[in-house]
Amino acid sequence: MKVIMTTKIDKASMNIREKLIENFGFTESNLTFDGNRVYEKEDILILTTNEEMIYYDYLDKEIEKQTKIKPEVIVFASRHSSAKKLPSLTTHVTGNWGKAMYGGKDESFAIAFPSAMKLALLKMHELNDLGWTVCYEATHHGPSELEVPSLFIEIGSSEEEWVNDRAGEIIAETIMYVLKKREKFKVALGIGGGHYAPKQTKVALESDLAFSHILPKYAQPVKKEVILRALSRSTEEVEAIYVDWKGSRGETRQLAKELANELGLEFIKD
């Protein structure tokens, strides 16, 4: 079963949940999760917790424990917060390049689902009649301790956007599209740029490249073994290392080049 994860303490999450139930024919099941009724449609479940999702390590195990169902994939429907309050529709995988400041474990990564994130990006871009920014975010926050592929799809970045009905509809439709469609793309690990990964976003929207984990400039430098770990945490094989050259530190550029040669991966310099 495929799982859409929501939380009661997140207004964007509840907005998206409401639109999923209203617009896509989800019905109450006889299951509960964390004391909340589970909704279902075909092979998709909507689960709701009462906690912050970013701190929910081992969620896949908890879902199996409470529902007796092993999830194939988890899509987190969430808010995105930023001081700049940029109206945005974003997607990313979770994990920590260094210290775990907001959930997860240090230097640990969830399993990326590159094709799903790319499909989410393309669908949000197509549906975006709000004029908001549509983008990847770099890999950040928890949960990192999950053994099934997962991704966050978010409404940002302030309460005004979180409760916007149209944004809720766009994300609900995007989630359903991602869970129903299967498409394969060439996969790259992304290195460089700011938190909103502008170059990686542009490349994903305009070419056949999909990204797994994205290492932003602010998280550099990182150790070789951390990049190797990120490379291994993808449900689809990573074939390339993509570097936003100006948006990366010198030592990280060099390390990326060396790793690509060592592992026989394509090196893409942008």
Curated annotation (Swiss-Prot):
Source organism per UniProt: Pyrococcus furiosus (strain ATCC 43587 / DSM 3638 / JCM 8422 / Vc1)
Cofactor(s) needed for function: Zn(2+)
Catalytic activity: a D-aminoacyl-tRNA + H2O = a tRNA + a D-alpha-amino acid + H(+); glycyl-tRNA(Ala) + H2O = tRNA(Ala) + glycine + H(+)
Free-text comment on the cofactor: Binds 2 Zn(2+) ions per subunit.
Listed EC numbers: 3.1.1.96
Role this protein plays: D-aminoacyl-tRNA deacylase with broad substrate specificity. By recycling D-aminoacyl-tRNA to D-amino acids and free tRNA molecules, this enzyme counteracts the toxicity associated with the formation of D-aminoacyl-tRNA entities in vivo.
Pfam families reported in the protein's UniProt record: tRNA_deacylase (PF04414)
Family as reported in the entry's similarity comment: Belongs to the DtdA deacylase family.
GO molecular function term, any single one: D-aminoacyl-tRNA deacylase activity
Keywords for this protein: Hydrolase, Metal-binding, Zinc
Top EC class, one word: hydrolase
Protein's name according to its UniProt entry: D-aminoacyl-tRNA deacylase
Gene Ontology terms describing biological process: D-amino acid catabolic process
HAMAP family: Deacylase_DtdA
Alphabetical list of Gene3D superfamilies matching this protein: AF0625-like
Subunit structure, interactors included: Monomer.
